[in-house]
UniProtKB/Swiss-Prot annotation:
The keyword Metal-binding applies. Glycerol binds at D119, D169, H252, H269. The keyword Iron-sulfur does not apply. Catalyzes the NAD-dependent oxidation of glycerol to dihydroxyacetone (glycerone). Its cofactor is Zn(2+). PROSITE patterns: ADH_IRON_1, ADH_IRON_2. One of its GO terms (cellular component) is cytosol. It comes from Thermotoga maritima (strain ATCC 43589 / DSM 3109 / JCM 10099 / NBRC 100826 / MSB8). This is Glycerol dehydrogenase. NCBIfam families: PRK09423.1. Zn(2+) binds at D169, H252, H269. Keywords: Glycerol metabolism, Metal-binding, NAD, Oxidoreductase, Zinc. CDD domains: GlyDH.
Length: 364
């Protein structure tokens, strides 16, 4: 039995970490191609941020908004031949796009998340969408980012919703890794996960339960606290290592299914993954104590527990079945669950999860 565990080359986290970005880039050379969110460029770093660089010349390009094949192709055409390193600065889709551009051009990549809303930063994976925002495919990359740099002072100033969504994404990590472990299903490398991966996935879950509420309060006050540092690490590093080396299963497949309904597109990745986690609890018949624990956590930090909270109030059975069918595509990770799963199973699990969430809110 061969197991494989993969990691980013270097993980840097802390208040003020952005101030050592040039130092990290200079290890790769003198020319950097930067893909950055427009909002981050203007309002977080400032448009003149790179003008203070003395060791590295920067070719800065604004991200178009969607991690699509078209955007990857557009940006790749703007990279100068002598570029030494590609840099992604912003949210998950910006980072995934930068990783894809670096892969296409065979360059090292440095990832700088400005929100802790997904576990995308550390992974050797880009999630590709259509230009309209519908999930298209996973792009598996041959290597993880060379550097992931997270400035928690920047994260603390972002709206709390982003950190909470990151907790929703991270919430799936242990449940999906545990399913893969039980089934001997492969992780994202195509091989089995290691003891290390499963332990990190469990640590991720425990950290969320222990520090999630305190971390949310910290970002609401725009303060960097030990609780925030722990949750940023859980959302970014632990979840990234856990999902990639532990494996994905139902929760992310259900997220992908939800993207077929346009009303969900304005909601964050982790918000939809949280619904996938809740549905998976009923899909895999988890003990009531665990179901209560997960719903309570979601309610405390502000994650959605009903379909209405991700834009699907009054969703028809026909549309919900479309979600279930997409989630059960033959190439989806839902087939890493220990038992066979059909679209009808997912349909009923979604309805059960929604009903339970509404019951707890006294809506039924």
């Amino acid at each position: 039995m061969i197991t494989t565990t993969i990691f980013p080359g270097r993980y840097v986290q802390g208040a003020g970490a952005i101030n050592i970005l040039e130092e990290e880039l200079s290890r790769f050379g003198e020319r950097a191609f930067v893909v950055i969110d427009d909002f981050v460029d203007k309002n977080v770093l400032g448009e003149n941020f790179f003008s203070s660089f003395t060791k590295v010349r920067v070719n800065k390009q604004i991200f178009g908004g969607e991690c699509s094949d078209e955007e990857i192709e557009r940006l790749s055409g703007l990279v100068e031949e002598e570029t030494d390193v590609v840099v992604g600065i912003g949210g998950g889709k910006t980072l995934d796009t930068a990783k894809a551009v670096a892969y296409k051009l065979k360059k090292p990549v440095v990832i700088v998340p400005t929100i802790a809303s997904t576990d995308a930063p550390c992974s050797a994976l880009s999630v590709i969408y259509t230009p309209n925002g519908e999930f298209k495919r996973y792009l598996f990359l041959p290597r993880n980012p060379d550097v992931v740099l997270v400035d928690t002072e920047i994260v603390a100033k972002a709206p709390a919703r982003f950190l909470v969504a990151g907790m929703g994404d991270a919430l799936a990590t242990w449940f999906e890794a545990e399913s893969c472990k039980q089934k001997y299903a492969p992780n994202m490398t195509g091989r089995l996960g290691s003891m290390t991966a499963y332990a990190l996935a469990r640590l991720c879950y425990e950290t969320l339960l222990e520090y999630g509420v305190l971390a949310k309060r910290s970002v609401e006050e725009k303060s960097v606290t030990p609780a925030l540092e722990k949750i940023v690490e859980a959302n970014t590093l632990l979840s990234g290592l856990g999902f990639e080396s532990g494996g994905l299963a139902a929760a992310h497949a259900i997220h992908n299914g939800l993207t077929v309904l346009e009303n969900t597109h304005k909601y964050l990745h982790g918000e939809k993954v949280a619904i996938g986690v809740l549905a998976s609890l009923f899909l895999t018949d988890k003990p009531r104590k665990m179901i209560e624990e997960v719903y309570s956590f979601c309610e405390e930090v502000g994650l959605p527990t009903t379909l209405a909270e991700i834009g699907l109030d009054g969703v028809s059975d026909e549309d919900l079945m479309k979600v279930a069918e997409k989630a059960c595509d033959k190439n989806e990770t839902i087939h890493n669950e220990p038992q066979p799963v059909t679209s009808k199973d997912v349909f009923f699990a979604l309805k059960a999860a929604d009903r339970y969430g509404r019951m707890r809110k006294n809506l039924t």
